[in-house]
Each structure stands twice: as structure tokens, then as C-alpha cells.
A protein has these predicted regions:
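Trp- and S/T/G-rich repeat-edge/linker motifs of beta-rich repeat architectures
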Residues: 42, 48, 137-161
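Secretory targeting and sorting signals
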Residues: 1-37
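Noncatalytic regulatory segments and standalone regulatory/sensor domains
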Residues: 8, 49-90, 101-106, 122, ...
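Conserved active-site-adjacent core of cysteine acyl-enzyme catalytic domains
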Residues: 90-92, 99, 280-431
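Active-site-adjacent structural segments surrounding the nucleophilic cysteine of cysteine proteases
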Residues: 190-304, 430-431
Length: 431
């Protein structure tokens, strides 16, 4: 299993461990993807298995189980709360949406959910996930985040490791314990509103990437494909010009690679927040939209702005269909570039392992894949450059594959307007 890399040029975060409750019974009913792999193949993990499943419109959301909620105008909304929950001194009525069970066709070891929602003041959502083994054992419902767009009277947060015999949580990622494999998974989203209020959050889409990857070793280097010579015009932003700024959001600089990269792809699509949304940023501040992204993607439990799902949820506020997944190769990234879609990619590498990088090494960093040279080298916007002028970089294809596929397992944020079609899906769909 891959180790989750949490911060570049720093130490990994240590998360508090809490006991997880027992799960209720249930049985998988939905099947997608390839036929189930054998137990032997799963244990060897010799193949890069990645699958993505989402419910992204009203018809799809109606396939879930509704409790105190209804689907109206393409979104799940609270209709008649099924209970009242006290959270940090306030009382909230709540309803739920629960996905069908999904069989990806292999024994998964990691999962990262994503969602798109609107949360008016006084509302928020909680996203949970559980899995089932071939023997029928259920993991607990583990929280992957309490989330809201706003932060004046609510703090979006992850809740720690939540360890049980089958799973644990590392920030935004559900991971199996030891040699456990989950052959089916399920999502649950709880919608909250202030008790007595009629204002509801709106869940417009939710899904998850699940994967089972080989252990260790360098990534195979693919030959250049059909995106050779295509470089997308992605605006350049440096995270380092924010060094030492806004200590309440982890001091900018090296901690802001993710919101800076998210800002770059939003700028590419001309979907940045309106200036009226960042009037709280002081006058004369350079790139205030980056500070806005850092604030509204900030995870107060993790104490950082690098939560993958919180970044795509932030991007979803601005008319984009955004999610986290893994790609299996640089060739798959080329398919997105050919379709006109830049990617935010998570990488890690040691000193001297990525020529032309603005940093010596990192145990977790995000940048934007924006294209390829005629010879297949990877053209990126790397926000770790000292200024916007140095953000555009060209990396060797083999070294980048090792840093990206070998580092995070190929994690990307896919951010695009819903009207922009995705590339044709693979036989084991991972987008």
C-alpha cells in the first residue's frame, strides 16, 4: 500500500486515533467494472487497478436511498429531517442519502471520495464511506470530512484515523488495514441544517475513486502519445509569493501548493471567484484569489489546505464538475490534455530525482500538468517556483512518471465545466 504523502519539505502530519463504531449489515447489489480478480492476484497487486464511480445528476442520485431527503432540481435536499444532532453547541436537523453498493471488480485498498454541494449559511454535510470483504465483514462508517462552503460559524474538518480491524482514514483517504481487501463499497452523505430552519444544503454529485496498486518500484515509462506538442494556456501562479501570509491558513508559501494549483486550473476555465468574494484580503495583496482558495479549501482537522477532496469541492463552487481520481500512466494524462483539460497532479520525489524542479525534494506536492513537448516531455506549471515567471517547467517523462505514479499512485484533480466532455473511458473506468 502506498504511504500517503502529506506535506512537502516538511514532516508528515500525525493524526489522532479514535475508536470506530460497529457497522450495520447490508449486501452489495450494484456491480461495475471488470470481473472480480482472483484472491491470488489481489494479494500480489501486480496490476494497477483504479476505478471511479459517481452519481452526478438527479436521475443518478435517485438510485440512492433517501432518508428525510428528496431529489429536486438535480440535487438532494432535506425534506423532513429524520433526527436532530448536536454539534459544537448547535442543534441541527438532518437527512441522509446513501449510495447503492458498488463492486469495482477487484479488492480495493484505498479510496478517495469527492462531492459537489452547496451549503447556505447554517448548513453543512458529512461524507462517510464503508466497505465489505468477500467474507461479508463490514467496516465501520468512517468520516472523510464535515464540509461546508462557508467558515464563519462552522469549520470544515476531517476527523482523524478512526481505526478498526479493516480500515483507517489518512486525511482524505480511506485505507485498508494490513492485508484486508474490500470488494464492495458504499457512500453515505448526511445533510444538516439548523434545527427549525427550512434552508437546506444541496448535494449535486458525489462519487469515489477506489484503487489497488502494486507495492513500491519505479513507474513504467510510457511512449509519447497523441498529445505530443500540445501545451494548454494555463495561467501561472506562484505559491511562494504568499510565504508567511495568513498564519491562520498555515502561513502560505510551501503549504499552499494545492490551492495555488486549483486556482490555476480555475483561471484556465475563467471560473475564478468574483472579487467581491475576497474583499477580506488586504488591499494590494498579490493574487488574492489564491488566498481565497486556501481559506475555503482549508481543513481545520488536518490544519492545512492540501486536502484533495476539499480542493475539488472548492472548485465545484464555480460551475465546474470536479473530482479526485488516479491515472495509471502518463499516456492517460495525455488523453486529458488532448481533450483540453489540464490536471492537478500530486507528486513526491527525493533530491536529484526530478531535474529542473524548483525544489530539491518533497514528500508531497501538487502542480498542474498542462501539456507535452514534441518529444513527450511533461510541461507543467509548478507553483513552487519563487515567482510566476519561473512556474512553467519541463520535466523528463520518466522522472515525472516516477514522482507522480510512483509517488501518489497517479492522483489527479480533474476540474472542468460540465459542458466539456471527458476523454473516452477505459475498460476499467477511472473517470
Amino acid at each position: 500500500m502506498l504511504i500517503r504523502r502529506l506535506a512537502w519539505l516538511g514532516t508528515s502530519a500525525v493524526l489522532a486515533v479514535s475508536a470506530a463504531g460497529a457497522a450495520s449489515a447490508g449486501s452489495p447489489t450494484a456491480a461495475v467494472g471488470t470481473p472480480p480478480a482472483s484472491a491470488a492476484a489481489d494479494s500480489q497487486l501486480s496490476v494497477r487497478h483504479v476505478a471511479y464511480k459517481q452519481w452526478a445528476d438527479g436521475d443518478a442520485l435517485r438510485r440512492g436511498t433517501l432518508a428525510g431527503t428528496r431529489v429536486r432540481r438535480g440535487a438532494v435536499r432535506i425534506f423532513d429531517p429524520i433526527g436532530v444532532h448536536s454539534y459544537r453547541g448547535r442543534r441541527y436537523g438532518f437527512g441522509r442519502w446513501t449510495s447503492p453498493w458498488v463492486r469495482p471488480g477487484f479488492g480495493l485498498t484505498e479510496a478517495v471520495p469527492s462531492w459537489r454541494a452547496a451549503t447556505p449559511a447554517g448548513t453543512w454535510i458529512s461524507v462517510e464511506m464503508r466497505g465489505r470483504t468477500p467474507r461479508g465483514l463490514l467496516s465501520s462508517w468512517d468520516s472523510l470530512g464535515n464540509w461546508a462552503e462557508h467558515d464563519t460559524k462552522f469549520r470544515r474538518t476531517t476527523l482523524g484515523a478512526q481505526v478498526d480491524d479493516l480500515t483507517r482514514v489518512s486525511v482524505d483517504t480511506l485505507q485498508t488495514q494490513g492485508r484486508s481487501r474490500l470488494h464492495a463499497w458504499q457512500l453515505r452523505v448526511t445533510l444538516y441544517r439548523r434545527a427549525g430552519s427550512t434552508v437546506s444544503p444541496r448535494l449535486r454529485g458525489v462519487g469515489s475513486m477506489v484503487s489497488a496498486l502494486p507495492d513500491g518500484g519505479d513507474a513504467a515509462t510510457s511512449r509519447p502519445g497523441s498529445a505530443r506538442g500540445i501545451v494548454l494556456d494555463v495561467p501561472r501562479y506562484s505559491q511562494m509569493v504568499h510565504r508567511g501570509e495568513y498564519p491562520e491558513y498555515n502561513n502560505g508559501g510551501q503549504a499552499w501548493c494545492s490551492p495555488t494549483s486549483t486556482t490555476m486550473v480555475l483561471a484556465y476555465w475563467n471560473r475564478l471567484p468574483d472579487p467581491s468574494e475576497y474583499t477580506w484580503v488586504r488591499d494590494g495583496y498579490r493574487d488574492p484569489e489564491v488566498a481565497h482558495a486556501a481559506r475555503y479549501a482549508f481543513d481545520y482537522g488536518f490544519d492545512g489546505a492540501g486536502n484533495w477532496a476539499f480542493n475539488t469541492a472548492y472548485a465545484g463552487r464555480y460551475g465546474t464538475s470536479s473530482f479526485v481520481t488516479r491515472l495509471r500512466s502518463v499516456r492517460e494524462a495525455e488523453r486529458f490534455i488532448k481533450a483540453g483539460i489540464p490536471l492537478v497532479a500530486s507528486i513526491s520525489f527525493g533530491a536529484g530525482e526530478l531535474d529542473n524542479s524548483p525544489i530539491r525534494g518533497t514528500n508531497g506536492h501538487l502542480l498542474v500538468i498542462r501539456g507535452f513537448t514534441e518529444r513527450g516531455k511533461v510541461v507543467v506549471n509548478d507553483p513552487a517556483a519563487e515567482s510566476a515567471k519561473g512556474v512553467r517547467r519541463v520535466y523528463r517523462r520518466d522522472q515525472f512518471a516516477d514522482a507522480w505514479i510512483g509517488g501518489s499512485g497517479g492522483v489527479v484533480y480533474v476540474v472542468r465545466p460540465g459542458s466539456t466532455p471527458l476523454p473516452r473511458r477505459t475498460s476499467e473506468p477511472n473517470w
